[in-house]
Structures are given as C-alpha cells and as structure tokens.
C-alpha cells in the first residue's frame, strides 16, 4: 500500500493525520513505517472470482475461458485445480519485473504443470534480485513451452510514481529489447481509454496483438474480454501467439466514469463478504502487515480488535462505506468525470 502517502499528499488534513501516526510508529518501533510491508487482498477468493468472470461471459451466451492471476504466485490457480468445476484452470501469474528505474508486470499464462514450480522459483529470484543480463534467458526459458503466453501488462501505468514521461520511455525501450519473447500487450479494463489507445498504437508498431486484461480487485467483472473460437486455453494461446489474432469486446461498465469505478472497487475492499474461500469474511482479515522483512504476515484483524483500529483507518472505512448509499452514489456520478467516450 505504498500508494497511500502519495494519494493523501493531495489532502492536507489527511496527510497531517498520517504524519502523526507515522511519528508515533517511529517512536514505538525505532524505524519508519514501511508501506511496502502493508498490503490488501481482493474481497473475492479464487473460486468466487472465477464464478464472477465466468458468469459475465456465460450471460452473453458464450463458453468461458478464464485465466486467474495474482501477483508473483500461482496459489489461486492451484487451489482452483483442486475443484471439479475448475480442474482445467491455467496456471498463470502476474510477474513483477524490476527494470532500471521502474518495474513492469508480465502476465505469464498457462505455465506447464510439471515445470510450474521451477519456473515460479526462478521468477521469484529475479524479482528479489533482478539482474538485467539474465532476463533474456529467463524469458526464452518461459517461451520454450508453446502453450505458454507472455503478455506485457499495462505498460504505460506509472505504478512506481517515477513520472509518466520516464515510464513511457522505459516501457517502449523494454518492449524494443524483449519484443522477441513477448506475445501480446494488455488492454486493461481498469485503465483509461486514452492509455489503452496508446497501448494499441504501441502494439501496432511492435507488430503484436493487444489482448484483454483486468486488474479486477473488487467485485466488478472484467470490463474488457477477448472473443475467440478456441475451445481450450491452449488453442487461445496459439491464436494470439502464432496467428497474432485478437478481438476484444468492451463491456458496458467500461464506459462508466473511471473514478466512479475505482471508488466502487474501494468500497468492495472494505465491505465484509460472507463465504470467502479462505474464511476471510471481514475486510480486516484481508489487509496484512509484515513487521519485518522476515516476519510473519499478520492480518489487521489480529493486530486490532474490531472497531479499535486507528481512527484514520476507521474514518477511511466509514467514508468508503458511505459511498454505498444510493443518493451518495448518484451524487458521486454527477460530480466525477463523465463516462468515457470510446473511439479508435
């Protein structure tokens, strides 16, 4: 959650309150609060997320092929493969690739089952200790399996906050160097149409297809989906990787105000959800903090009793839940930017 101080910097009262908590933490622990050791997980477990995505596609009268990814681990697809209804779930991951002054995310879809563990170990080592000279060999190894798909996810998203111009330049340089091992670029359902349009232009210049992707962290199904005649995910990989064909369908929710949709995702995060696959029904069950680099990741529900969280957290949760009210939702839609106009 290292975006929190950057986000609150634009809100002076909240920023001042945050500094008070940071000073208190520093006095108590003798070190600064490391926001990289604080993170949240989506409100839906793998089973629920898969059902959500499948349901949207089936409502169109289509047969769903869904690849569920998480950052830097394949626990979700491994769990799905235990269930009868999702035994064919592809083993996929969103891999964090530190590169020069930024980091990128590559979607690695449909890893070979027998080699998935070895590949994930190698990816984790690179993320922990990146060596640029090793990246070509690692990507080449991933691509040895012809049923694996490598997607450059949201290349223009300035997640690290290094500056948009630098992010754009590094993304284009990264693609020019590793183009041989990248099979497609992602159009992301939670990024603006302006940004996705730039990604389409970049893909066209590189001679690569653009495919749909998500970053669905709430309860809204993906706003962009691929249409295909493939009957299996391996066939879909071949269609993208070797035939270079991709048809992306824009769902109605993508036309809504992006700010409104992001706020909706935040509301989903701080809402309690019964029936979570891991039993994480409270929002505080799904927010974790690691006190040290080698320490245990502990949910906030174990650190604070319900209702005894720091006032800044309680105020944030209360404000987010206020946005669930129908009148507040309507007001937000009126105040925020209008729906996106889509044009090629």
Region roles according to the model:
Residues 1-23, 78, 83-87, 99-116, ...:
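Charged catalytic cores and adjacent phosphate/nucleic-acid-binding surfaces used
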Residues 66-67, 89-93, 150-152, 185, ...:
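Hydrophobic faces of well-ordered beta-strands that scaffold small-molecule active sites
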Residues 1-140, 144, 189, 193-203:
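A metal-dependent hydrolase metal-coordination microenvironment
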Residues 70-71, 153-156, 216:
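Short, well-ordered beta-to-alpha junction loops that form the rim of enzyme active sites
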Residues 135-171:
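Internal, conserved structured core segments that host functional sites
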């Amino acid at each position: 959650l290292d975006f929190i101080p950057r986000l609150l910097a634009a809100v002076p009262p909240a920023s001042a309150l945050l500094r008070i908590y940071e000073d208190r933490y520093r006095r108590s622990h003798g070190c600064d609060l490391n926001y990289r050791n604080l993170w949240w997980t989506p409100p839906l477990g793998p089973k629920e997320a898969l059902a959500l995505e499948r349901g949207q596609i089936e409502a169109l009268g289509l047969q769903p092929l869904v690849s569920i990814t998480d950052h830097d681990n394949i626990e979700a697809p491994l769990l799905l493969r235990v269930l009868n209804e999702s035994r064919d779930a592809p083993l996929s991951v969103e891999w964090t690739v530190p590169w020069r002054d930024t980091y990128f995310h590559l979607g690695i879809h449909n890893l070979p089952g027998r080699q998935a563990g070895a590949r994930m170990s190698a990816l984790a080592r690179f993320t922990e200790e990146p060596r640029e000279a090793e990246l070509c060999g690692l990507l080449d190894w991933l691509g040895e399996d012809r049923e694996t798909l490598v997607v450059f996810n949201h290349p223009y998203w300035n997640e690290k906050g290094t500056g948009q111009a630098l992010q754009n330049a590094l993304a284009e340089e990264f693609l020019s160097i590793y183009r041989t091992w990248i099979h497609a670029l992602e159009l992301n359902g939670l990024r603006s149409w302006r940004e996705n349009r730039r990604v389409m232009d970049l893909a066209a210049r590189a001679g690569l297809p653009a495919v749909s992707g998500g970053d669905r962290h709430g309860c809204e199904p993906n706003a962009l989906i691929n249409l295909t005649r493939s009957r299996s995910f391996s066939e879909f990989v071949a269609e993208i990787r070797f035939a270079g064909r991709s048809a992306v369908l824009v769902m109605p929710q993508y036309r809504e105000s992006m700010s409104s949709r992001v706020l909706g995702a935040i509301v989903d995060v701080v809402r309690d959800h019964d029936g979570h696959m891991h039993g994480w029904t409270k929002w505080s069950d799904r927010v974790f903090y690691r006190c040290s680099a080698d320490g245990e990741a502990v949910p906030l529900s174990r650190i604070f009793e319900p209702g005894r969280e720091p006032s800044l957290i309680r105020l944030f949760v209360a404000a987010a839940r206020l946005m669930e009210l129908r009148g507040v939702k309507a007001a937000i839609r009126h105040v925020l930017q209008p729906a996106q106009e889509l044009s090629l």
